[in-house]
Amino acid sequence: ISNSTLQEKRDAFRYVIGASSLIVFTTGIIVYNFLNIEINSKAKIGDFKDMKKLMKSRSVILIGLIILTAYMGYKTTDIYSLYASEIMLFDEIEAARIAAYQQYLRPLACISIAFFADKSGNINVIIGGFAIMLVGAILFASGIVVAGLNSLFILSLIIVATGTYILRGLYFSILKDGKIPTTLSGTAIGIVSIIGYTPDIFATPLYGYLLDTYEGIKGHQLVYIILSISSLIGIY
């Protein structure tokens, strides 16, 4: 990779985008053609009264906040490679490899925790996920994860990533714990998604501002302080 020309890197990036788009498009066709859903013609779809009712529901608001605070952890995955290169002094290839490897935790954590949640309950496991994410965030926020302590860096990254993916694998499953009627689950998911995915709007600019304004480890510490606060809110 390090010996690739700019044109070769562009071509590789183009192939990645093309392959991803093809997979998404193919998945859409498969779902459309093979997922049979029975629709009751008498049922009202998109009833505004139901939407207003759900927007006033304490359960919907709380689930939205759980997703929001959990998603703050997911947004930190964008800066793992930056931490590796700026603070741990890894080269560009090593930093990218670290960011790629942590992605393998996602299917492992999500699948494993699904079985565990069946026995322990979704809410209890989600609280545990926030607690795990909090521990990792505190390690990074403390400033002790610095160049030369590669094992501590890997351990801290695994802790944060594991907590993040535990939450990501379960947060929509708590809709039933919120006693939301199945007939309104689609509308409820839409509302909690609007609340929960707002970090897509503000988290990246916020993290970017902190990292640009406060050079070195200071900026990263501030990012993980925010993540620690988000984890505490999620636990609460």
PLM feature segments, named:
Residues 98-106, 192, 196, 230:
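Transmembrane alpha-helical segments of major facilitator superfamily
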Residues 179-215:
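A late C-terminal transmembrane helix in Major Facilitator Superfamily
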Residues 2-21, 208-231:
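A membrane-interface helix-boundary motif in multi-pass transporters
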Residues 109-122, 211-212:
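Helix-to-loop junctions at the C-terminal end of transmembrane segments
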Residues 59-110, 203-204:
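Extracytoplasmic gate region of multi-pass secondary transporters
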Residues 21-41:
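C-terminal membrane-cytosol helix-exit motif in multi-pass small-molecule transporters
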Residues 36-63:
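Juxtamembrane intracellular "pre-TM" segments in multi-pass secondary transporters
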